[in-house]
Amino acid sequence: MFTKRTDLAIEAHELWQESAGKTTRLAGVKATEKKIQGYPVTQVDILDREGEAALGKPAGSYRTLDLTAFWQRGDGFFDRAVRAVGQQVKELTPDSGPVLVVGLGNRAMTPDAVGPLAADSILITRHLIDAMPQHFSGFRPVAALRPGVLGTTGVESAEAVRGLVDRLHPSVVIAVDALASRRVGRVCCTVQFSDTGIIPGSGVGNHRSALNRETLGVPVLAVGVPTVVDAATLAADLLEESDLSEPDLETLRSRPENLMVTPRDIDQQVRDLGKVIGYGINWALQDLEIEEINALLS
Protein backbone atom coordinates (compact mmCIF):
# COMPACT_ATOMS: atom_id res chain seq x y z
CA MET A 1 0.00 0.00 0.00
CA PHE A 2 1.28 3.48 -0.89
CA THR A 3 1.80 5.58 2.25
CA LYS A 4 1.61 9.34 1.96
CA ARG A 5 4.54 10.87 3.77
CA THR A 6 4.18 13.72 6.25
CA ASP A 7 5.86 14.84 9.47
CA LEU A 8 2.90 17.02 10.51
CA ALA A 9 0.38 15.67 13.03
CA ILE A 10 -2.36 17.86 11.53
CA GLU A 11 -1.84 16.13 8.18
CA ALA A 12 -1.74 12.67 9.74
CA HIS A 13 -5.12 13.55 11.28
CA GLU A 14 -6.39 14.67 7.85
CA LEU A 15 -5.18 11.44 6.24
CA TRP A 16 -7.03 9.41 8.86
CA GLN A 17 -10.20 11.43 8.23
CA GLU A 18 -9.90 10.83 4.49
CA SER A 19 -9.60 7.09 4.97
CA ALA A 20 -12.17 6.65 7.75
CA GLY A 21 -14.64 9.36 6.84
CA LYS A 22 -15.29 12.60 8.70
CA THR A 23 -18.35 11.15 10.42
CA THR A 24 -16.17 8.74 12.39
CA ARG A 25 -14.68 10.04 15.63
CA LEU A 26 -11.03 9.19 16.15
CA ALA A 27 -10.58 7.65 19.59
CA GLY A 28 -7.51 8.73 21.54
CA VAL A 29 -7.13 12.00 19.63
CA LYS A 30 -8.43 15.49 20.43
CA ALA A 31 -8.24 18.35 17.92
CA THR A 32 -8.96 22.03 18.64
CA GLU A 33 -8.51 25.31 16.76
CA LYS A 34 -7.89 28.92 17.83
CA LYS A 35 -6.15 32.10 16.69
CA ILE A 36 -3.09 33.79 18.20
CA GLN A 37 -1.98 37.22 16.98
CA GLY A 38 -4.27 36.70 14.00
CA TYR A 39 -2.61 33.43 12.95
CA PRO A 40 -4.60 30.15 13.15
CA VAL A 41 -3.33 27.42 15.49
CA THR A 42 -4.52 23.82 15.29
CA GLN A 43 -3.75 21.61 18.28
CA VAL A 44 -3.81 17.82 17.93
CA ASP A 45 -3.42 15.94 21.22
CA ILE A 46 -2.65 12.23 20.95
CA LEU A 47 -3.92 10.87 24.24
CA ASP A 48 -3.19 7.14 24.28
CA ARG A 49 -1.92 4.12 22.34
CA GLU A 50 -5.06 3.99 20.24
CA GLY A 51 -4.35 7.52 19.04
CA GLU A 52 -0.69 6.65 18.48
CA ALA A 53 -1.66 3.71 16.29
CA ALA A 54 -4.17 5.74 14.29
CA LEU A 55 -1.84 8.65 13.49
CA GLY A 56 1.52 6.89 13.63
CA LYS A 57 2.99 9.39 16.08
CA PRO A 58 3.89 9.23 19.79
CA ALA A 59 1.42 10.49 22.39
CA GLY A 60 1.75 14.18 23.16
CA SER A 61 0.67 17.64 22.08
CA TYR A 62 1.18 18.83 18.50
CA ARG A 63 0.41 22.45 17.62
CA THR A 64 0.49 23.73 14.06
CA LEU A 65 0.80 27.49 13.59
CA ASP A 66 -0.43 28.63 10.16
CA LEU A 67 1.77 31.50 8.94
CA THR A 68 0.31 31.74 5.43
CA ALA A 69 -0.67 35.38 6.09
CA PHE A 70 2.95 36.12 7.08
CA TRP A 71 3.95 36.15 3.41
CA GLN A 72 1.32 38.78 2.62
CA ARG A 73 3.45 41.23 4.63
CA GLY A 74 0.51 42.93 6.34
CA ASP A 75 0.68 45.38 9.23
CA GLY A 76 2.94 44.12 12.01
CA PHE A 77 3.32 40.74 10.28
CA PHE A 78 6.79 40.03 11.69
CA ASP A 79 6.09 41.09 15.27
CA ARG A 80 2.79 39.19 15.33
CA ALA A 81 4.46 36.05 13.96
CA VAL A 82 7.24 36.30 16.56
CA ARG A 83 4.70 36.60 19.39
CA ALA A 84 2.62 33.73 17.99
CA VAL A 85 5.70 31.48 17.89
CA GLY A 86 6.79 32.71 21.31
CA GLN A 87 3.40 32.00 22.86
CA GLN A 88 3.60 28.35 21.80
CA VAL A 89 7.13 28.05 23.18
CA LYS A 90 6.03 29.63 26.49
CA GLU A 91 3.14 27.23 26.90
CA LEU A 92 5.20 24.11 26.11
CA THR A 93 8.37 24.80 28.14
CA PRO A 94 9.19 25.31 31.85
CA ASP A 95 9.11 28.95 32.96
CA SER A 96 12.52 28.82 34.65
CA GLY A 97 15.89 27.10 34.42
CA PRO A 98 18.63 26.94 31.77
CA VAL A 99 17.67 26.25 28.16
CA LEU A 100 19.60 24.58 25.35
CA VAL A 101 18.51 25.50 21.81
CA VAL A 102 19.64 23.07 19.11
CA GLY A 103 19.63 24.10 15.45
CA LEU A 104 19.45 20.79 13.63
CA GLY A 105 20.22 20.36 9.95
CA ASN A 106 22.72 21.00 7.19
CA ARG A 107 23.41 24.70 6.64
CA ALA A 108 24.83 23.92 3.19
CA MET A 109 21.56 22.31 2.04
CA THR A 110 19.02 25.14 1.85
CA PRO A 111 15.78 23.24 2.66
CA ASP A 112 17.56 21.72 5.67
CA ALA A 113 19.05 24.98 6.98
CA VAL A 114 16.13 26.30 9.03
CA GLY A 115 17.57 24.92 12.29
CA PRO A 116 21.03 26.51 12.02
CA LEU A 117 19.47 29.77 10.79
CA ALA A 118 17.12 29.87 13.78
CA ALA A 119 20.08 29.28 16.10
CA ASP A 120 21.80 32.31 14.53
CA SER A 121 19.02 34.51 15.94
CA ILE A 122 19.12 33.10 19.47
CA LEU A 123 20.23 35.47 22.23
CA ILE A 124 23.04 33.53 23.94
CA THR A 125 23.26 34.49 27.62
CA ARG A 126 24.70 31.57 29.60
CA HIS A 127 28.29 32.83 29.57
CA LEU A 128 27.31 36.49 30.05
CA ILE A 129 25.40 35.95 33.29
CA ASP A 130 28.61 34.94 35.08
CA ALA A 131 30.92 37.30 33.18
CA MET A 132 28.78 40.44 33.51
CA PRO A 133 26.20 39.86 36.24
CA GLN A 134 25.56 43.59 36.61
CA HIS A 135 24.07 43.62 33.10
CA PHE A 136 22.73 40.10 32.58
CA SER A 137 21.71 38.73 35.99
CA GLY A 138 18.04 39.17 35.06
CA PHE A 139 18.35 37.05 31.93
CA ARG A 140 17.55 33.37 31.64
CA PRO A 141 20.62 31.19 30.87
CA VAL A 142 20.45 30.12 27.22
CA ALA A 143 23.01 28.18 25.19
CA ALA A 144 22.83 27.13 21.54
CA LEU A 145 24.31 24.29 19.53
CA ARG A 146 24.52 23.68 15.79
CA PRO A 147 25.64 20.03 15.69
CA GLY A 148 25.86 19.83 11.90
CA VAL A 149 25.26 16.51 10.18
CA LEU A 150 26.91 13.11 10.49
CA GLY A 151 28.41 13.27 7.01
CA THR A 152 30.52 16.34 7.79
CA THR A 153 31.20 15.88 11.52
CA GLY A 154 31.30 12.12 12.03
CA VAL A 155 29.15 12.64 15.13
CA GLU A 156 25.45 11.90 15.46
CA SER A 157 23.44 14.97 16.45
CA ALA A 158 21.92 12.97 19.30
CA GLU A 159 25.39 12.12 20.63
CA ALA A 160 26.51 15.75 20.58
CA VAL A 161 23.32 16.98 22.22
CA ARG A 162 23.40 14.25 24.86
CA GLY A 163 26.96 15.16 25.83
CA LEU A 164 26.05 18.82 26.21
CA VAL A 165 22.91 18.03 28.18
CA ASP A 166 24.99 15.99 30.62
CA ARG A 167 27.29 18.99 31.06
CA LEU A 168 24.77 21.88 31.17
CA HIS A 169 21.76 20.20 32.82
CA PRO A 170 19.16 22.33 30.99
CA SER A 171 15.55 22.40 32.13
CA VAL A 172 14.49 21.86 28.51
CA VAL A 173 15.98 21.34 25.06
CA ILE A 174 14.38 23.24 22.17
CA ALA A 175 15.23 21.50 18.89
CA VAL A 176 14.54 23.26 15.57
CA ASP A 177 14.56 21.24 12.35
CA ALA A 178 13.13 20.94 8.84
CA LEU A 179 10.13 18.69 8.21
CA ALA A 180 8.27 17.24 5.23
CA SER A 181 4.66 18.10 4.38
CA ARG A 182 2.16 16.33 2.15
CA ARG A 183 0.83 19.60 0.71
CA VAL A 184 2.71 22.34 -1.12
CA GLY A 185 0.45 24.92 0.54
CA ARG A 186 1.93 24.15 3.95
CA VAL A 187 5.58 24.32 2.90
CA CYS A 188 7.22 27.28 4.69
CA CYS A 189 3.74 28.37 5.80
CA THR A 190 3.40 26.36 9.00
CA VAL A 191 5.39 25.72 12.16
CA GLN A 192 4.76 22.60 14.24
CA PHE A 193 5.46 22.54 17.97
CA SER A 194 5.58 19.19 19.74
CA ASP A 195 6.50 18.11 23.26
CA THR A 196 7.37 14.59 22.04
CA GLY A 197 10.84 15.36 20.66
CA ILE A 198 12.15 14.97 17.12
CA ILE A 199 14.19 12.72 14.84
CA PRO A 200 16.92 14.85 13.19
CA GLY A 201 16.90 14.82 9.39
CA SER A 202 13.38 13.44 9.08
CA GLY A 203 12.30 16.29 6.82
CA VAL A 204 14.84 15.45 4.11
CA GLY A 205 14.52 11.70 4.48
CA ASN A 206 17.71 11.13 6.49
CA HIS A 207 16.44 9.74 9.77
CA ARG A 208 18.91 9.69 12.67
CA SER A 209 18.68 8.95 16.40
CA ALA A 210 15.76 10.60 18.20
CA LEU A 211 16.01 13.58 20.53
CA ASN A 212 13.39 13.16 23.25
CA ARG A 213 12.96 12.83 26.99
CA GLU A 214 13.83 9.12 26.84
CA THR A 215 17.18 9.66 25.09
CA LEU A 216 18.23 12.94 26.77
CA GLY A 217 16.63 12.72 30.21
CA VAL A 218 15.08 16.21 29.95
CA PRO A 219 11.95 17.56 28.22
CA VAL A 220 12.39 18.27 24.50
CA LEU A 221 10.31 20.79 22.57
CA ALA A 222 10.50 20.15 18.84
CA VAL A 223 9.95 23.12 16.54
CA GLY A 224 9.62 22.01 12.93
CA VAL A 225 9.08 23.83 9.64
CA PRO A 226 8.02 21.85 6.55
CA THR A 227 10.38 22.90 3.75
CA VAL A 228 9.87 20.00 1.32
CA VAL A 229 7.15 17.76 -0.08
CA ASP A 230 7.82 14.14 -0.97
CA ALA A 231 7.38 13.97 -4.76
CA ALA A 232 5.45 10.69 -4.72
CA THR A 233 3.08 12.01 -2.05
CA LEU A 234 2.52 15.18 -4.06
CA ALA A 235 1.82 13.15 -7.20
CA ALA A 236 -0.62 10.90 -5.33
CA ASP A 237 -2.58 13.89 -4.05
CA LEU A 238 -2.69 15.42 -7.53
CA LEU A 239 -3.92 12.15 -9.03
CA GLU A 240 -6.67 11.88 -6.43
CA GLU A 241 -7.71 15.50 -6.87
CA SER A 242 -8.00 14.82 -10.61
CA ASP A 243 -10.30 11.85 -9.88
CA LEU A 244 -7.95 9.46 -11.64
CA SER A 245 -8.41 5.78 -10.98
CA GLU A 246 -6.69 3.87 -8.20
CA PRO A 247 -4.44 1.78 -10.54
CA ASP A 248 -2.55 4.96 -11.43
CA LEU A 249 -1.19 4.99 -7.87
CA GLU A 250 0.53 1.66 -8.52
CA THR A 251 3.12 3.54 -10.57
CA LEU A 252 4.05 5.55 -7.49
CA ARG A 253 4.38 2.43 -5.36
CA SER A 254 6.87 0.92 -7.80
CA ARG A 255 9.19 3.94 -8.08
CA PRO A 256 12.41 3.51 -6.04
CA GLU A 257 13.57 7.15 -6.25
CA ASN A 258 13.37 9.39 -3.19
CA LEU A 259 12.69 12.85 -4.62
CA MET A 260 11.76 16.02 -2.75
CA VAL A 261 10.04 19.17 -4.04
CA THR A 262 10.80 22.60 -2.57
CA PRO A 263 9.85 26.19 -3.53
CA ARG A 264 11.99 28.17 -5.97
CA ASP A 265 12.59 30.94 -3.42
CA ILE A 266 13.35 28.55 -0.55
CA ASP A 267 16.51 30.54 0.33
CA GLN A 268 14.59 33.66 1.34
CA GLN A 269 11.74 31.75 2.95
CA VAL A 270 14.07 29.70 5.15
CA ARG A 271 16.00 32.82 6.19
CA ASP A 272 12.81 34.65 7.14
CA LEU A 273 11.35 31.71 9.07
CA GLY A 274 14.63 31.01 10.83
CA LYS A 275 14.61 34.60 12.11
CA VAL A 276 10.96 34.42 13.18
CA ILE A 277 11.58 31.20 15.12
CA GLY A 278 14.77 32.49 16.73
CA TYR A 279 13.12 35.74 17.78
CA GLY A 280 10.05 33.85 18.99
CA ILE A 281 12.19 31.68 21.24
CA ASN A 282 13.96 34.78 22.60
CA TRP A 283 10.61 36.47 23.23
CA ALA A 284 9.39 33.41 25.12
CA LEU A 285 12.49 32.93 27.26
CA GLN A 286 13.52 36.50 28.04
CA ASP A 287 11.48 39.43 29.35
CA LEU A 288 12.24 41.53 26.27
CA GLU A 289 10.36 43.36 23.56
CA ILE A 290 11.15 42.64 19.93
CA GLU A 291 12.94 45.99 19.53
CA GLU A 292 15.21 45.10 22.46
CA ILE A 293 15.97 41.69 20.93
CA ASN A 294 16.91 43.47 17.70
CA ALA A 295 19.28 45.79 19.55
CA LEU A 296 20.98 42.98 21.47
CA LEU A 297 21.51 40.86 18.35
CA SER A 298 22.74 43.70 16.13
Give the residues covered by each predicted segment.
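Glycine-rich phosphate/diphosphate-binding loop of Rossmann-like nucleotide-binding domains
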Residues: N106-R140, A144
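Conserved active-site and cofactor/substrate-binding residues in soluble primary-metabolism enzymes
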Residues: G60, G76, R80, A84, ...
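An N-terminal, well-structured beta->alpha segment
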Residues: E50-P94
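N-terminal amphipathic/basic leader segments beginning at the initiator methionine
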Residues: M1-A59
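Short glycine-rich or small-residue beta-strand-to-loop segments that form or flank ligand, phosphate
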Residues: D66-T68, P98-M109, A144-G148
